[in-house]
């Protein structure tokens, strides 16, 4: 069952074998595994509960109901916009369905540098196999790629680079283009229509609009204290307490460390909130003399990853298509006044690609502000900046190869090319400082780092905190490094594997 704040009229007191904070990939997968193992599971989610009938394919509704800060969450200096879901299903409800396995070189690095055990490619293969079957992860046939994805496939191949289709977790996709706004057809097999319903079927209880404020681990039973929030007004209605011997924090790489910091727990290493990575992202736009319509069709089904770890340094970049909805386009498209209006009038003829950087020199941190909410910082530079420049150059070349008449980046000062020969010179003279180029992330990672040494990490290889037995963090915050792929498959696999370990080793007798 799903209990919403509108159903609550008095303080809530509950107990369970395990309380899971967050209902995205980490929390949802953990809930299903543990509920099906016969454990009493309670999931609490700060966001609301919405179904396909609530998804009207408009940005106004989606940003208000499904995203953190109405899609306006950012670093403190406003340099990086951070897109995260805040609803049952978490970010899986609003992602673009790309489903990729963790690269082998990343898992090898985790083992060699951080002594992570049990997460090799061989260890995770059965989990990936099972998840891909469960979520119907598949490659789209050639005829299903929309014009925006064809830019990458056709343009990269014309230049002699490798581009390929990417896996997607959908079934009977209607190609409506609304993945980022909530799928109105339940065709996207996100956590809200897969793991959460199956967890409920196995006996789990899910509470929507329940915000975890603090965790107390001082007693025999751990306790989660929080607030029941009205979905419409966002005002606190009452409070809740959930008691359980096992707590799983699965609130994302931004909000999991914030919760631990507010609670004053699991931080003997001083590492809670550190090592934030973003897969820092910017975009390249091409203007064509044909209709592209960047918000139509399957939003993301192709990529070029040839330059990921090409120098064997663990870094690099990859390029994907990005669906550009009108409101998002109006914010991202460079220029002011008549120039901006002229570009928006050509909206249907614009193709958009994103460059995502797998950081090796850059990282940030999540701390607490004066109100106990996340304060997010990020320092970008070194080899990562060079990879971003290389990626933007390649993406621009791909657009020209695909037939674009002019191409632009998202610099605050006009940065536009009318031929491939102009790209290098224009980018060399562009400004790259803070807020000089629009930067984004939908993949915050790493703020509760996993490693076997307790002085350099927050959790061990089973996602259990070094400091508190029975307290786990299971979400994107545990990755020791950035991934180089969209993270949902990695998080799901780690969650399923860790939840199995919890059932066998921490809840065996329950």
Q: What residue ranges belong to the model's regions?
A:
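N-terminal Rossmann-like FAD-binding beta1-loop-alpha1 element of flavoenzymes
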Residues: 18-43
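FAD cofactor-binding and catalytic pocket of flavoenzymes
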Residues: 95, 237, 269-399, 433-435, ...
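Residue-level detector of alpha-helix initiation sites
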Residues: 24-25, 254, 478
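Glycine-rich loop(s) and the adjacent beta-strand/alpha-helix scaffold that form part
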Residues: 33-40, 47-52, 56-57, 201, ...
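Redox-cofactor-proximal catalytic regions of oxidoreductases
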Residues: 60-140, 355-365, 369
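Extreme N-terminal leader/targeting segments of oxidoreductases
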Residues: 1-18, 36, 76, 496, ...
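A conserved FAD-binding loop/helix module that cradles the flavin
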Residues: 481-499
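Conserved redox-cofactor binding core of oxidoreductases
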Residues: 113, 117-214, 218-221, 406-437
């Amino acid at each position: 069952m799903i209990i919403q704040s509108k159903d609550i009229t008095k303080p809530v007191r509950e107990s369970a074998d395990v309380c899971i904070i967050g209902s995205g990939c980490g929390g949802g997968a953990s809930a299903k595994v543990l509920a099906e193992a016969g454990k009493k599971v309670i999931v609490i989610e700060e966001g609301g509960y919405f179904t396909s009938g609530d998804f009207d394919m408009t940005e106004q509704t989606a940003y208000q109901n499904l995203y953190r800060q109405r899609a306006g969450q950012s670093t403190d200096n406003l340099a990086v916009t951070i897109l995260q879901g805040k609803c049952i299903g978490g970010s899986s409800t609003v992602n673009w369905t790309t489903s990729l396995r963790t690269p082998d070189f990343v898992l090898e690095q985790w083992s060699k540098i951080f002594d992570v055990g049990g997460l090799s490619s061989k260890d995770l293969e059965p989990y990936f196999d099972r998840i891909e079957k469960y979520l119907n992860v598949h490659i789209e046939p050639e005829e299903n790629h929309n014009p925006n994805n064809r830019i990458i496939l056709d343009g990269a191949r014309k230049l002699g680079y490798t581009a390929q289709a990417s896996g997607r977790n959908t079934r009977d996709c209607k190609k409506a283009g609304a993945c980022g706004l909530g799928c109105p057809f339940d065709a996207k097999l996100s956590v809200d229509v897969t793991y959460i319903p199956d967890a409920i079927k196995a006996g789990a209880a899910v509470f929507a609009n329940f915000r975890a404020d603090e965790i107390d681990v001082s007693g025999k039973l751990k306790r989660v204290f929080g607030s029941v929030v009205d979905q419409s007004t966002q005002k606190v209605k009452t409070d809740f307490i959930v008691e359980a011997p096992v707590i799983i924090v699965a609130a994302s790489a931004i909000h999991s460390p914030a919760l631990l910091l507010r609670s004053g727990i699991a931080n003997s290493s001083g590492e809670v909130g550190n090592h934030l990575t973003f897969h820092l992202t910017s975009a390249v736009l091409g203007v064509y003399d044909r209709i592209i319509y960047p918000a139509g069709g399957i939003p993301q089904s192709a990529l070029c990853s040839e330059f990921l770890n090409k120098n064997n340094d663990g870094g690099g970049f990859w390029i994907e298509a990005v669906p550009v909805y009108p409101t998002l386009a109006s914010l991202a498209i460079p220029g002011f006044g008549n120039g901006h209006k002229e570009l928006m009038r050509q909206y249907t003829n614009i193709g958009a690609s994103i460059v995502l950087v797998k950081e090796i020199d850059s990282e940030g941190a999540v701390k607490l502000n004066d109100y106990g909410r996340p304060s997010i910082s990020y320092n970008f530079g070194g080899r990562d900046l060079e990879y971003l420049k290389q990626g933007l150059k390649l993406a621009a070349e791909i657009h020209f190869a695909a037939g674009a008449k002019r191409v632009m980046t998202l610099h605050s000062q006009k940065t536009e090319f009318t031929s491939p020969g102009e790209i290098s010179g224009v980018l060399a003279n562009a400004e790259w400082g803070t807020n000089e180029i629009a930067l984004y992330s939908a993949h915050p990672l790493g703020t509760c780092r996993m490693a076997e040494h307790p002085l350099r990490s927050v959790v061990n290889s089973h996602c259990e905190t070094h400091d508190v037995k029975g307290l786990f963090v299971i979400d994107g915050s545990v990755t020791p490094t950035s991934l180089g792929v969209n993270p949902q498959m990695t998080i799901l696999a780690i969650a399923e594997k860790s939840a199995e370990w919890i059932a066998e080793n921490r809840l065996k007798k329950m």
